[in-house]
Amino acid sequence: MYRLLCLLALLTAAGLMGCASQRGLTPPPDLQAHQQQLQAVASWQIDGKLGIRSPQESGSATLKWQQQPDNYQIYLSGPLGQKRLQIIGAPAAVTLLQSGQPPMHAQSAESLIKKAAGWTLPVSQLSYWVRGLPAPKTPITGLQLSPQGLISELQQANWTIHYSNYRDYYHGETRLALPGKIQAEYRDLRLTLVIRDWQLGIH
């Protein structure tokens, strides 16, 4: 369970920094406008449940993710509040904290995944995907939209991401649709994130 919680935390933490142009398929103009509004939200928080499933093992954790422009904090806990983990991240440093264990440090969350869980995964796109955004620097190889013009399926970096349960939230005067459920699949690995609440523009 500890290895799974480490992986869940670090998958979430990976790649929260970075910005560049996209290649591959181009989203339609209405979707591009929506994405530009989302990218303008520099601070946000989500509360929910994150799960992972592979042929070898599976597990889940309660998640709180607080994002600021240049740093973030992620809290995860296993069933009944056991195995609490905290990730603290800045542009050039990531720290994993767990009660009773020495802190683990690295320059990136990808490095910590390898150190803590023994997995090597291309996960720098996840912080974009969670907001319903295609990740920068990575070609879009597949894109399907809902009747409302929002992403229902995205294919990028050999992952397939399914979106559902969109709900409206406000950032100032701007109304934004954000996903309530995300399923990401890569070969025989599946991540499921159920988001109970979004808070936009937190400080």
Swiss-Prot record:
Residue spans crossing the bilayer: none
Biological process terms from the Gene Ontology for this record are: lipoprotein localization to outer membrane; protein transport
Instruction: Keyword check for Thylakoid, yes or no.
Output: no
Query: Which CDD domains does the protein's record reference?
Result: LolB (cd16326)
* InterPro entries, alphabetized: LolA/LolB/LppX, OM_lipoprot_LolB
Which UniProt keywords are listed? Cell outer membrane, Chaperone, Lipoprotein, Membrane, Palmitate, Protein transport, Signal, Transport
User: Chief location of this protein?
Assistant: membrane
Q: Which residues form the signal peptide?
A: 1-18
Q: Please name one Pfam family that this protein belongs to.
A: LolB
Which residues bear N-palmitoyl cysteine-type lipidation? C19
- Gene Ontology CC annotations of this record: cell outer membrane
Q: How does it sit in the membrane?
A: Lipid-anchor
**UniProt xrefs under SUPFAM superfamilies:** Prokaryotic lipoproteins and lipoprotein localization factors
Subcellular localization, as worded in the UniProt entry: Cell outer membrane
What is known about its subunit structure? Monomer.
Q: What does this protein do?
A: Plays a critical role in the incorporation of lipoproteins in the outer membrane after they are released by the LolA protein.
What is this protein's record name?
A: Outer-membrane lipoprotein LolB
